[in-house]
Regions:
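N-terminal membrane-proximal hinge/A-helix region immediately C-terminal to the signal-anchor transmembrane segment
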Residues: 1-93, 108, 113-120, 155-156, ...
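Cytochrome P450 I-helix active-site segment
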Residues: 5-10, 111, 115, 167, ...
């Protein structure tokens, strides 16, 4: 076993800058040069990054006491009781409760609501002019996650949330994660002050609705907020603190709509731009009655959604921090070092996905990929609780898009993949589309 530092770039600043400039290609080039696992950096913390099936499996399957809370100040951004911040027993306990709520509440019955929202939103899109699809899909996806979290909500209240989260997204750049110096309040125009003010607005809105849910006696409510607020211990005390519910909802509302909207934008681009895919998808849809349950059983529709998540993973890596030493692929890693499973590298492995640069949905019809080969929503104990809902939403929205008359790409040039907060999204607002005027 090697006791030498992992091969990789030595300068933390240059490594972070290279990743920021080219998040989709930087680590692939570094791995080609240095091998797997790759030594790298996240901020000023050393990182061991792997995309090999064996390495990813080891990262995901490590015992519970292997990891500690990540030294990057995620708590300062997401909240001290957010799922991505917690480790060990606290993480497992919150995860079980959130999973139970998402599997039994509004999220478990969201299919018809997603279809209704998608049809209404897409019917209102402007016609006769080219426009970026990204903002339109973000609005649609935010409407879906609002329905899941809050149920039916007054339009004015929904718009207040939309504006608050849009402001939060503008000020929660990846630079705040990578560069600790930016997380200082230097006055009204400093990045950290603007982030804190945007987050305070979001927290205030959630606190108001949480207080109303705590005081409500409506047992018929099945929205996520109401069900989290209603959880009780054996002695009748609330299972979750207000802070835990608030931090959980911030993650669900922000990551839940931004990541799904980005995935839908890539699915739209590739399905419309890849010869043969859209006709095959429409033929499959023509044989379906259009109900949500029926659409969710269509194999090629699901394959298109999964291939979009493979070719352009929205979350480029899943990172943990070692609480104790680990040996990864023959390299001894010390406690305190970060280890990451890279979806970016794993999803482009030609040994697992032949011709990985090509959009080929049929690969998901011909084979079943294991959890350490295809993991767009994370893996192991860190699998995203909203994974099932997100995949359903991508499929149902893609079905509505494919059935929308006159929808075409206005520009076949693919956008670049760039950071939007900690996630990767299409540049320039995503693919440009054109909805032709309807004949009268």
């Amino acid at each position: 076993m090697s006791e030498e530092p992992l091969p990789g770039p030595r300068c933390w600043f240059a490594a972070n800058l290279g990743w920021l400039r080219d998040p989709a290609g930087y680590h692939a080039r570094q791995r080609q040069r240095f091998g797997d696992p790759l030594g790298g950096w996240l901020g000023r913390l050393r990182l061991a990054l792997t995309g090999s099936p064996a390495g990813v499996r080891q990262v995901f399957a490590a015992p519970l006491d292997t990891y500690a809370p990540v030294g990057v100040d995620l708590a300062g951004m997401l909240g001290a009781e957010a799922l991505p911040v917690l480790e060990g027993a606290a993480h497992l306990a919150l995860r079980r409760r959130v999973n139970a709520v998402l599997l039994e509440g509004e999220a478990a019955q969201a299919g018809p609501a997603i279809l209704a929202i998608a049809r209404a939103e897409i019917a209102a899109w402007p016609r006769g002019r080219a426009m970026p699809a990204g903002p339109l899909l973000q609005r649609l996806s935010f409407a879906v996650i609002m329905r899941v979290v809050f149920g039916v909500i007054a339009p004015g209240r929904a718009e207040a949330y939309r504006a608050a989260f849009a402001r939060l997204a503008r000020h929660a750049g990846i630079g705040l994660v990578l560069l600790p110096a930016l997380r200082r309040d230097l006055g009204p125009w400093s990045p950290w002050r603007r982030f804190l003010e945007a987050r305070a607005t979001v927290h205030r809105l959630i606190a108001e609705d949480l207080a109303a849910a705590r005081a409500s006696s409506d047992a018929a409510r099945f929205d996520t907020l109401a069900r989290l607020a209603a959880l009780r211990e054996a002695d009748g005390a609330p299972s979750l603190s207000d802070a835990a519910i608030r931090d959980t909802l911030v993650v669900l509302l922000s990551a839940g709509h931004e990541s799904t909207a980005a995935a839908m934008a890539w699915a739209l681009l590739h399905c419309w731009a890849t010869p043969g895919v859209l006709p095959r998808l429409r033929a499959e849809l023509d044989g379906c009655d259009g109900a949500a349950a029926s659409l969710l059983r269509l194999p090629f529709l699901e394959a298109c959604a999964r291939e979009a998540l493979r070719i352009a993973p929205v979350a480029p890596m899943m990172v943990r921090q070692l609480a104790r030493p680990m040996t990864l692929a023959g390299h001894d890693l010390p406690a305190g070092m970060l280890v990451g499973a890279s979806a970016e590298l794993a999803h482009a492995d030609p040994a697992v996905f032949p011709e990985p640069e090509k959009f080929r949905p049929e690969r998901f019809l011909d084979a079943r990929f294991r959890a350490h080969e295809f993991f767009p929503f994370g893996g192991g104990r860190r699998l995203c609780p909203g994974a099932r809902l997100a995949l359903e939403e991508i499929r149902l929205v893609l079905a509505v898009l494919a059935r929308t008359p006159g929808l075409a790409l206005a520009d076949h040039r693919p956008p670049r993949r760039v950071f939007s907060g900690p996630l990767l999204a299409p540049s320039r607002g995503g693919p440009r589309i054109l909805l032709q005027e309807q004949a009268t």
